Amino acid sequence: MEKTLTLTNAVMIDGVSVDKLKYDTDKITAPLFARAEAAKKQAMGIANVAMTPMAEFDFTLHLYLGFAAIIGCNPQIDFIDLERIHGRDTMEIMAIGRNFILKSEDLTTNNSDDVIEITPELSTQA
């Protein structure tokens, strides 16, 4: 679902000051995911390193997947443009990528009306 991120700090993209960016994690394709991973490694200076942390704990990947969600809606923007974003906006974009990885937007709530039955186990044999 397409949403709009309002930036606290406007960023210059193609000579235009931008303070709103559309994004949609459903538009992250396999090639865009791979480009996000490659851009992350390049930014970190580890382009040739094969070992990476688990995706759930890779906060830099979360940021670049947030960038990918923006690029999915705005193909004229690239990772280099988005790397100029700074401050709190960086954390907001990282949260977009984190939610994509963790699927937190799709979590269902627990129905407290369900009956949970707990049967204690015997600690000693009879």
Locate each region found by the language model:
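Short, surface-exposed, charged amphipathic helix/loop patches that serve as local interaction elements
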Residues: 2-126
